[in-house]
Structure formats: structure tokens, C-alpha cells
């Protein structure tokens, strides 16, 4: 998959440590096209000391890790976004004012994909109070939830899945969301998602429901919060929404810590 923040973060970090970096563009690589993942892994593992992979299938990054013989970092798959979790955990620790195992956060929106899955597992591992607010059809898979609950039993974490946004955000220290349509999905799914999620936007009113004057807003970016992008303008012209998963008022408010997070 294409990347802005994840690629830049890896490249800057590597160069800060004196490492060289090679970027293989999705359209310019033969990975999975003319050459299998297994063969690619064994070639790159002989040339490089580490590999960061950002793509679609979780199985692909796991196969790379199995055969490369060097550390492989998951820069994002459809299922998980672990390096973003490092940034999210650090950001919450910086802004919480209390230990993470005494911190509550809510994720609002489409919870089937990498961000909600990863936040669920992250929160469970850190013993946090995790709430997912989403239509039941857009909840994480039963397998992911079961894994998170098993971890939470050991760490003292709490996990709540609910269709009620007010229940999800009540008492929360942080409110997360993400885009409603992911990379690679066709435009045709927008209408369906908007119909399902129109009551799951992060608005000033929803932030206030937390009852926490210090509640913070988080988003891994990019966000559709206004009409200042081609997609944002298309959404406005097609569906009449100025801002989708989050309003401009919340995104640009003092409660927003998205750029610290990014």
C-alpha cells in the first residue's frame, strides 16, 4: 500500500541511526507478481538487515518474516497496524496524566479493520479500559475479540463492545476514530458506510458526552474532516457531508492530539 506517515517515520528513524534505506514502490516491485513472497523474502533477507512491509494481507508479512531470516516490521496490513500502536501508546501516555492501566479510551466507527483490531489488542495488553462503539455488523471479528479478552483477563484490562456511542465514550480519556472507507475499497461502498455510520461521527456533542473536560481526540490520519481534499469535496458534493468520521470543529479543537500521534 502507499504511505506517507509510516514510510517517513521508518526512513527518518533508520537514517537517524545511520542505516541505509531502499524503497520498493508497490507498482514497481515484482513481489507476488512474478516472484513469490517466499522467494522475495529469501532474496531481500540476504541483502538487508531488516524489512518493513506495508500491504494488504496479514499472511504476506508473516510469510516474509518466516523466510527472510532478518527482522520484518509490519507497517500495516488489513488486519493490524502495530507500529501505529507504538505511536498511539506513547501519545496517550504523554497526554493522560495517569498510568495507562488506569486510562479509558473509546474507538468509534468501523471497527472491523487494522486500527480497531490493533487498539483492542493494545489496550488489552496494557490493561486499559477499551470501548468499541460501532454497529454490530462492523465490530471486530470474534477471533480478534476472543484474543483480546484472553489477554485482558491476565492484565486486568476491560473490553466493551456496544452499538451505543454514549455508552462507549462515557468517562473516556481518549476518543479514537478512523476513516469509514479503507484504501483499496471502491467508491461504491461510501453510501452503504454513511448509512451505517452516520450516527457514529465524532462531534463536539459526542466529545462532551464523555463528561471529561480533558478528553482528547485521536486519529491515525489521513482524516476526512473538511472539504480541502479532492475526496473530501467529492464526499460533500455527493453526500452533503462536510467532514465524515470527525467534524472540523473537533479535528481543529484544543482536544485534538492527532499531530502528536502522527
UniProtKB/Swiss-Prot annotation:
Record annotation: effect of changing residue 205 to D: In strain: Vedros M601 and LCDC 81-176
Full protein name: Ornithine carbamoyltransferase
Pathway per the UniProt entry: Amino-acid biosynthesis; L-arginine biosynthesis; L-arginine from L-ornithine and carbamoyl phosphate: step 1/3
Residues annotated as binding L-ornithine: 114, 178, 182-183
UniProt-listed PANTHER family: ORNITHINE CARBAMOYLTRANSFERASE, ORNITHINE CARBAMOYLTRANSFERASE, MITOCHONDRIAL
Subcellular location: Cytoplasm
Catalysis performed (reactions): carbamoyl phosphate + L-ornithine = L-citrulline + phosphate + H(+)
Amino acid at each position: 500500500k502507499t504511505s506517507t506517515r509510516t514510510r517517513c517515520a521508518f526512513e527518518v528513524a533508520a537514517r537517524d541511526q545511520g542505516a541505509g534505506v531502499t524503497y520498493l514502490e508497490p507498482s514497481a516491485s515484482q513481489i507476488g507478481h512474478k516472484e513469490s513472497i517466499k522467494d522475495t523474502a529469501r532474496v531481500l533477507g540476504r541483502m538487508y538487515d531488516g524489512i518493513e512491509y506495508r500491504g494488504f494481507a496479514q499472511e504476506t508479512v508473516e510469510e516474509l518474516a518466516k523466510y527472510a531470516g532478518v527482522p520484518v516490521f509490519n507497517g500495516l496490513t488489513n488486519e493490524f497496524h502495530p507500529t501505529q500502536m507504538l505511536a498511539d501508546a506513547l501519545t496517550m501516555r504523554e497526554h493522560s496524566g495517569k498510568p495507562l492501566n488506569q486510562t479509558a479510551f473509546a474507538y468509534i466507527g468501523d471497527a472491523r479493520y487494522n486500527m480497531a483490531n490493533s487498539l483492542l489488542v493494545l489496550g488489552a495488553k496494557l490493561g486499559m479500559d477499551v470501548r468499541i462503539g460501532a454497529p454490530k455488523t462492523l465490530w471486530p471479528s470474534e477471533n480478534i475479540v476472543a484474543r483480546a479478552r484472553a489477554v485482558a483477563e491476565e492484565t486486568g484490562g476491560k473490553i466493551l463492545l456496544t452499538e451505543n456511542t454514549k455508552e462507549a465514550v462515557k468517562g473516556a480519556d481518549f476518543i479514537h476514530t478512523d476513516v469509514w472507507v479503507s484504501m483499496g475499497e471502491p467508491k461504491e461502498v461510501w453510501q452503504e458506510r454513511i448509512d451505517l455510520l452516520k450516527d457514529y461521527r465524532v462531534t463536539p456533542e459526542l466529545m462532551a458526552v464523555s463528561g471529561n473536560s480533558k478528553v482528547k481526540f485521536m486519529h491515525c490520519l489521513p482524516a476526512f474532516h473538511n472539504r480541502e481534499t479532492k475526496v473530501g469535496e467529492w464526499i460533500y458534493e455527493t453526500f452533503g457531508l462536510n467532514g465524515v468520521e470527525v467534524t472540523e470543529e473537533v479535528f481543529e479543537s484544543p482536544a485534538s492530539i492527532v499531530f502528536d500521534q502522527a
